[in-house]
Design a protein with these regions (language model features):
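Extracellular Ig-like/FN3 beta-sandwich strand-entry sites
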Residues: 94, 153-155
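Positively charged n-region of N-terminal signal peptides that target proteins for export
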Residues: 1-6
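Contiguous segments within soluble domain cores/interaction surfaces
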Residues: 29-147, 161, 167-169
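A short tyrosine-centered beta-strand micro-motif
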Residues: 156-160
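Bacterial N-terminal signal peptides
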Residues: 8-18
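Boundary at the C-terminal end of the N-terminal hydrophobic targeting segment
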Residues: 20-27
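Surface-exposed, short loops/turns at beta-strand junctions within beta-sandwich domains
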Residues: 148-152
Length: 175
């Protein structure tokens, strides 16, 4: 298990997500522009979760354009990036988020120490709790992991809390 931080690479992927999230926040479907009720969850009055997605991050074979593909299955291939993106509207400039990543068994490694926030592990080694305080900027918060040699196969779960309130739960299979 390895936490990945590819800021420049991720920004290109996230900009695509932002367009869809902004359309949804405006009551429009990102696919066809039709009016739909916005999927909005209120968090602590000042913060609203607009949309959240889980999936795979990848690059073109030539190392060009990054891609985000929604998925509920992560290939058990070392180096495969996966994670979540959540669009948030807030009158706050900084947002606190907490991620609880639960694996079916403890991995060989959780990777390098967290450099942008805090990470704690459960006593049994199956749960990593990552917390960060981030600038909201373009309205997107995210986290990504890379599959590492020795990661367990099976059902994983990520719970994301924004400003102390459960915002999204992502369940997916690694195989």
């Amino acid at each position: 298990m390895k936490n990945t931080t590819r800021i420049v690479w991720m920004l290109a992927v996230l900009s695509t997500f932002a367009v869809a999230a902004n359309a949804q926040a405006a009551g429009k479907s990102a696919e066809d522009g039709a009016s739909t009720p916005p999927a909005v969850m209120e968090i602590a009055q000042a913060t609203r979760v607009i949309r959240g997605e889980f999936g795979l991050f990848s690059e073109d074979a030539d190392g060009g354009e990054p891609h985000f593909v929604r998925s509920k299955t992560v290939p058990l291939v070392p180096g495969q990036s996966y994670g979540w993106v959540i669009a948030v509207r807030s009158n706050q400039q900084r947002i606190h988020w907490r991620e609880e990543l639960t694996l079916p068994a403890s991995p060989v490694t959780w990777g390098a120490p967290e450099t942008q926030g805090r990470r704690a592990l459960s006593d049994d080694g199956r749960v990593a709790i990552t917390e960060r305080e981030v600038d909201l900027g373009d309205g997107l918060i995210y986290n990504a992991w890379d599959v590492a040699a020795g990661d367990p196969q099976g059902r994983y779960r990520i719970r994301v809390f924004v400003e102390g309130t459960l915002a999204k739960v992502f369940e997916f299979d690694v195989r």
